[in-house]
Amino acid sequence: PFASLIDGDFEEKKEYFRHYCAFFYKMGYDTVSFEQCIGACMPGAGALGNHVDPVIKNRADFEAYPWEEIPTLYFERFSEDFRALQEVMPAGMKTIGGPGNGIFECVQELTGYTGLCYLMADDPALYADLFRKVGQTNQMIWKQFLDRFADLYCVMRFGDDLGYKSNTLLSAQDIRQHIIPAYCGIVQLVHEAGKPFLLHSCGAIFDVMEDLIDTVGIDAKHSNEDQIAPFPQWVERYGDRIGNFGGIDTDAVCHLTKPEMREYIADVIAKCSGHGGFAFGSGNSIPDYVPAQGYLNMIETVRELRGEKI
């Protein structure tokens, strides 16, 4: 076990990343996925991730909140992690990631989803100001991050779950008005640094995909769940304009046998071929309840189908 090494001194962090990068290399990846989340550095946060009492419930809370401290807290906490990774990155590999958490998630860390919905009705001005302020703060973090660590990365990304099984969590109009402008500022910085931007967003977000592609300028999108739309549907609809990351529903990784998984994956690849570039993997992050053998079956199947000898 090496997980605790990341909490050690700089040399221990480097040893952690040697093991961490070796895993991706041995699994056949060209990239290492690594991010550190902004929400972890927001004072009083946790209303989304840990269901704590929201730190912002009204205008007075908003005005008293230490917004200006967040960028400093972020880099004080995480700069050594990124530097350690930078020093041990294997030759020929790059990283995908950056400052984790998108605008919607960071707002919810302070208000909770229910609290945010109440503010939408009770104080529309505060509701708008929350997105504006989080957008400004996160953009400051991204600017500093790209100045320091852009060379470590081949693709920049954050995750911001805008939807659920059948719709977006906010109206499409609210996403366009309050979230899309903040995305634009960050993605512009990413593009100015010469990097492509990948958005991870769960849910049925079809109503805002045109905005994400045409207005924000995302270069790729990740997340798929068969109950919403099988991966080939995303590739067929958007593959001529953006890259698509994903492929196999994470639930299928849990339950399919290796022969069943091979049939599933071969079918997905066949349907996606000819519709632009895609990167095959799980439709969402691999949680701890996924059987290790299921994950290994996925990796081995894809590597075999692309012609590797395992």
Residue ranges and their predicted role:
Residues 2-7, 42-50:
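Glycine-rich loop at the start of a catalytic domain that most often binds anionic cofactors/ligands
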Residues 2-14, 18-19, 30-33, 54, ...:
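Active-site loop segments of alpha/beta catalytic cores
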Residues 16-46:
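Glycine-rich, N-terminal phosphate-binding loop and its surrounding beta-alpha-beta segment
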